[in-house]
């Protein structure tokens, strides 16, 4: 699963996920992309599950790019622990997603196959997504 190799600080404040994606909002590497149209978080497990769904469907063909990286730690306290006594330990990592962000890209497969692979991957993600193709001249 994806997670940072090292971090300067183990824990991070919650923050607010606002605005729309300006960077990473167009297909840059592949021919087709899976674009999020909702705001939210993708965990490393969700990204990996979607990647596996795409890989299984396209079999040996094509090349896949993951355009997001889960670099934000989410901390949790253990079950049945009283309130207080500081912040919990980091349990998993998430990628903050703004509307318009491309999550996956693929090249080397026909459009119908890419569409179906992204449909299967979208079922693994908690956000609404749409299929996009590379613009002519990009």
UniProtKB/Swiss-Prot annotation:
Pfam families: Ribosomal_L16. One of its GO terms (cellular component) is cytosolic large ribosomal subunit. Residues 1-13 have a biased composition (Basic residues). Residues 1-21 are annotated as: Disordered. InterPro entries: Ribosomal_uL16, Ribosomal_uL16_bact-type, Ribosomal_uL16_CS, Ribosomal_uL16_dom, Ribosomal_uL16_sf. PROSITE patterns: RIBOSOMAL_L16_1. CDD domains: Ribosomal_L16_L10e. GO terms for biological process: translation. GO terms for molecular function: rRNA binding; structural constituent of ribosome; tRNA binding. Keywords: Ribonucleoprotein, Ribosomal protein, RNA-binding, rRNA-binding, tRNA-binding. Belongs to the universal ribosomal protein uL16 family. Part of the 50S ribosomal subunit. Binds 23S rRNA and is also seen to make contacts with the A and possibly P site tRNAs. This is Large ribosomal subunit protein uL16. The gene is rplP.
């Amino acid at each position: 699963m994806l997670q940072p190799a090292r971090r300067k600080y183990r824990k991070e404040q919650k923050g607010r996920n606002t605005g729309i994606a300006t960077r990473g909002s167009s297909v840059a590497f592949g021919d087709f992309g899976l674009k999020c149209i909702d705001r939210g978080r993708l965990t490393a497990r969700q990204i990996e599950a979607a990647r596996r769904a795409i890989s299984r469907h396209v079999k040996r063909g094509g090349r896949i790019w993951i355009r997001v990286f889960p670099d934000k730690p989410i901390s949790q306290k253990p079950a049945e622990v009283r309130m207080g006594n500081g912040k919990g330990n980091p349990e998993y990592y998430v990628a903050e997603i703004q509307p318009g962000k491309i999550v996956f890209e693929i090249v080397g497969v026909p459009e119908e196959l890419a569409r179906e692979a992204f449909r299967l991957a979208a079922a693994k993600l908690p956000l609404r997504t749409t299929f996009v193709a590379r613009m002519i001249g990009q």
